[in-house]
UniProtKB/Swiss-Prot annotation:
A GO molecular-function descriptor: pyridoxal phosphate binding
HAMAP family registered for this protein in UniProt: HisC_aminotrans_2
Family to which the UniProt record says this protein belongs: Belongs to the class-II pyridoxal-phosphate-dependent aminotransferase family. Histidinol-phosphate aminotransferase subfamily.
Gene3D superfamilies associated with the record: Aspartate Aminotransferase, domain 1 (3.90.1150.10), Type I PLP-dependent aspartate aminotransferase-like (Major domain) (3.40.640.10)
SUBUNIT field: Homodimer.
Protein name per Swiss-Prot or TrEMBL: Histidinol-phosphate aminotransferase
Annotated source species: Pseudomonas putida (strain GB-1)
Required cofactor(s): pyridoxal 5'-phosphate
Listed PROSITE patterns: AA_TRANSFER_CLASS_2
Membrane-spanning parts: none
Catalytic activity: L-histidinol phosphate + 2-oxoglutarate = 3-(imidazol-4-yl)-2-oxopropyl phosphate + L-glutamate
Length: 348
């Protein structure tokens, strides 16, 4: 703490990201990165941007990427917002859409950045308990609110809320913005983007860090009614008019255009997930149903924190959350078959 800090900074409780180990020999199954590389076409497109044009500012609107997203999902570019990772997109959403008198609602088990944003922007919030199966009860959100946000599939549980239930939540909250955070939707769910033309209060966020293997590039997006998108553009242009560099815009656009590679990579992750679930269940683990590129598992005879520490000593990193209701679970990223086998060998 410095004497130069403002009182505001002193009271901030920042987000704690997953560990990024420096030792290459570790099997990294803790931050939900894709074990398969980006689209080769996207890599080639980015290499093409490494020229004298880097002396010029990038397109502040990211129109090439907006067009690619719009074509992929069957919406218009005016319904698309892009930013420097979905975390930045979410920050703009909190800043521009959730600062009202009533509290923001989100699940008690969800992305731990949500309360951080609330602290940063002075947003009152209420964490609504998931049911015993870690699912949202729609009736629990039938109360005055400044908005609703939830991850689908849930992070960190991986549990999926069906699209029909998402629509029921929208119908029950027509006067509030409902944000569906779809960081992991491509690994087993149905996107709510198909609903944006019917619900002007719906905003869907996604990232290219997971299913499109571009975590190191930092690209995120939101899709919704043009009025909601305009609010995000106003916040963006009051903060950073050039959030995406030239290579990121082109590489992300091509990642959307290369559907064949994207579908192949997702399919491999899903197949590996189902194999790993079976292997862990055979070892006595309870594994929650997952529609993500990770699983949430616990063992009735093992303390999760101690197990995570022992796995690390054997060169395998998984994520443990010291949080009520889930303190005995481990979140395990789906790796390549070889990475998953290393986990199983360590458990043995």
């Amino acid at each position: 703490m410095s004497r130069f800090w403002s009182p505001f900074v002193k009271d901030l409780v920042p987000y704690v990201p997953g560990e990024q180990p420096k030792l290459a020999r570790l099997v990294k199954l803790n931050t939900n990165e894709n074990p398969y590389g980006p689209s080769p076409k996207a890599l080639e497109a980015m290499r093409g941007e490494l020229n004298d044009n880097l002396r010029l500012y990038p397109d502040p609107n990211g129109d090439r990427l907006k067009q690619a997203v719009a074509e992929y999902y069957g919406v218009t570019p005016a319904q698309v917002f892009v930013g420097n990772g979905s975390d930045e997109v979410l920050a703009h959403i909190f800043h521009g859409l959730f600062q009202h008198d009533a509290p923001l609602l989100f699940p008690d088990i969800s992305y731990s950045f949500y309360p951080v944003y609330c602290g940063l922007y002075g947003i009152a919030f209420e964490q609504v308990a998931l049911d015993e199966q870690f699912q949202i009860r729609i009736e629990d959100y039938n109360k005055p609110n400044a908005g609703i946000i939830f991850p689908n599939p849930n992070a960190p549980t991986g549990c999926l809320m069906p699209l029909q239930a998402v629509e029921q939540l929208l119908l029950a909250n027509r006067d509030s913005v409902v944000v569906v955070d779809e960081a992991y939707i491509d690994f087993g769910g149905e996107t709510a983007i198909s609903l944006v033309d019917r619900y002007d209060n719906l905003l869907v966020t996604q990232t290219l860090s997971k299913s499109r293997s571009l975590a190191g590039l930092r690209v995120g997006l939101a899709v919704g009614h043009p009025d909601l998108i305009e609010a995000l553009e106003r916040i963006k242009n009051s903060f950073n008019s050039y959030p995406l560099d030239r290579a990121a815009i082109v590489g992300a656009a091509v990642a959307f255009e290369d559907r064949e590679y994207f579908e192949q990579a997702c399919r491999k992750v899903i197949e590996s997930r189902e194999v790993l679930v079976g292997e862990l269940q055979a070892k006595g683990f309870e594994v929650l149903p997952s529609a993500a590129n990770f699983i949430f598992a616990r063992h009735p005879k093992q303390d999760a924190g101690e197990l995570a520490a022992r796995l690390r000593k054997q060169g395998v990193i998984v994520r443990h959350f010291k949080q009520p209701r889930i303190a005995q679970f481990l979140r395990i990223t789906i790796g390549t078959p070889e990475m998953n086998q290393a986990l199983l060998d360590a458990l043995s």
